[in-house]
Amino acid sequence: KALNESIPVYKKLNASAMIVLIGENAEYNENNVLKCLNAAKPIVERENVTLIIEPLNNIDRVGYSMPYAKPTFELLRKVNSPNIKMLYDIYHQNMMGDFSIDDIRNNIDIIGHFHVADAPGRHEPGTGKVDYVKIIDEIEKLSYNGYIGLEYRATKPDSETLGFLNL
């Protein structure tokens, strides 16, 4: 129901993707999520809508039911829809100890969006342990043409936080 109600808004805004979260309780197990995504599949394909599933770490978001990238990739491979992809949030995967450049390489076809923030702290790149120069370089080599969202809490002016992008 929520998906059908959201699609007209999505289209009116001419949005390129609809980011969705899975949920924060035990009933959002893999079988239920798979069932829901398979139910959404014909709708999003017919309406040419892209759903992007975002795994969030369950350290900052206690109780979030889908914190890891690997099982999310496996789930999306089972759904097998060009209209259902993953938001690979580099911060969240680093917080879970699950970040892998190989995961990005092997699944770039089902990544619909990236989020960037350093870990720990969720501040701009260069304030934590994540090597964003290497990561962005690798994403470029993979010919990724989607969005990379900067989702961090800046500790200095924006003009000083974007050096990792080599703009």
Task: Describe the residue ranges of each PLM region.
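Active-site acidic/histidine proton-transfer and metal-coordination neighborhood
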Residues: 1-85, 95
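Histidine-acidic metal/acid-base catalytic patches
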Residues: 8, 14, 50, 66-88, ...
